Amino acid sequence: EAIEIDVEGIASHAGAHPQDGVSAVAIASLAISDLVENGWHGLIQKGRNTGASNIGFVSGGEATNVVMPNLKLKAEARSHDMKFRERIVKEIRKAFERAAKKLKNAAGQRGSVSFWSDLKYESFALSPKEESVQTARAAVESLGMEPELRICNGGLDANWMTAHGIPTVTLGCGQDGIHTVNERLYIDSFLQACAVGLKLATGQES
């Protein structure tokens, strides 16, 4: 679930009148610290429930001599359990709202938070008996490989296709260390995936 958060502080001169300002980045920092300390950022495990959240974009500020008046953040929440994903979103919202209430300037004024969330795709899991799963399994086995069924925590075209009535399998293609500086592609695995794709598309093996 995609999340956008606008934090509104109060601008003031950071040298002459810092007490008159409310820092938007200070509000966001308190909120993020709250989420981390209480286990609602990164990998989330609460009892039997699991999920993840991430704040991946932060933008704001005008100059070093201005108490930051506004800050925009973009985040996301994930879980294979719809209700738990909604809980994660709720906890993120509450953390930012609490943080905004904690800070005030010399005049007693506080900043504010605007919060939006939008479900980009729903999670899904296919039965091993699903026809598309059986077809993919057969293609892998026909090429002398052993299929391994896994649940993926990424967002895929398969999410949309399955949601629209087309049960869809995604095949591994040799990626490793995704979205890191160590990201790599194992060529042998990639070529195996190409062979499976060709088999599924044409019935041919080469």
Task: Give the predicted meaning of each segment.
Residues 4, 10, 14, 19, ...:
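Metal-dependent amide/peptide-bond hydrolase catalytic core
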